[in-house]
């Protein structure tokens, strides 16, 4: 990853295209929560945050899921501080046993699908009864792996995006909406 200063990150934010305002993202999270409750309210699921990007959508969803569940997290990444994916690196988790349990994986974005598919495979290998996948955003693009998600907040164009958990070179995960990086800053 090329180093970026806070000032450069702020410039990226100021020049970005707002794809979805905060109110639109919150509405999408409301809709996701309703769908998740319908499917999983009686399943005693383990809700799993996929770090780091999943932390914002996970936290926002969690308080909307008014039913018994356990919380866990995993940190497995193909990106680290890079903008292009590499080999999958397992950093932490899972911690709550998944055998014979329903698992809900929550992430910020479905891009190529490789990371989410690998995490799903790990939970299936660990004996999960069912694995559901929820993503705040799904890029409209071909995937490197065949993967379907059960709950999607928003479909987004195939651009470099940030906000609501997604980052620009380690910054801007906290942006109050979903933004696309201007072409001048994409490298």
Explain the meaning of each model-derived region.
Residues 1-187:
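PRPP-associated nucleotide enzymes
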